[in-house]
C-alpha cells in the first residue's frame, strides 16, 4: 500500500470477494443515488448509497473507471471507501 501524499486521498474499492483498488488518488468521482459526487482531500465525512454509473479516479497521472450498480460509500478527511455490492454487468442473464 502506497503512502498518501499531501493533495491525495486514500481510495479503497472493495467487493465482498476482493479488493479492486487500494491506494492514493488525486480525486475520485462516485455515482450516488441522487447524482455524482467528487471526492477530494479534506472532504467532509459522509456515508451514502451508490447509484448505477462509473466510479472514476485519478491515480498516478491516469484516469481509471469502474462500472458499478449498487453499494455504499464512506468518506473521511483522508480516506474514501467504495463498498460495491454489484459491479456493472453482473447479475445479467
Model-identified regions with their sequence ranges:
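Compact, glycine-rich, soluble single-domain proteins
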Residues: 10-93
Amino acid at each position: 500500500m502506497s503512502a498518501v501524499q499531501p493533495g491525495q486521498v486514500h481510495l479503497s474499492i472493495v467487493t465482498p470477494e476482493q479488493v479492486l483498488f487500494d491506494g492514493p488518488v488525486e480525486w475520485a468521482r462516485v455515482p450516488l443515488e441522487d447524482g455524482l459526487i467528487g471526492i477530494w482531500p479534506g472532504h467532509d465525512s459522509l456515508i451514502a448509497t451508490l447509484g448505477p454509473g462509473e466510479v472514476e479516479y485519478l491515480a498516478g497521472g491516469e484516469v481509471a473507471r469502474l462500472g458499478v450498480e449498487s453499494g455504499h460509500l464512506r468518506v473521511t478527511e483522508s480516506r474514501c471507501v467504495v463498498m460495491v455490492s454489484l459491479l456493472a454487468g453482473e447479475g445479467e442473464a
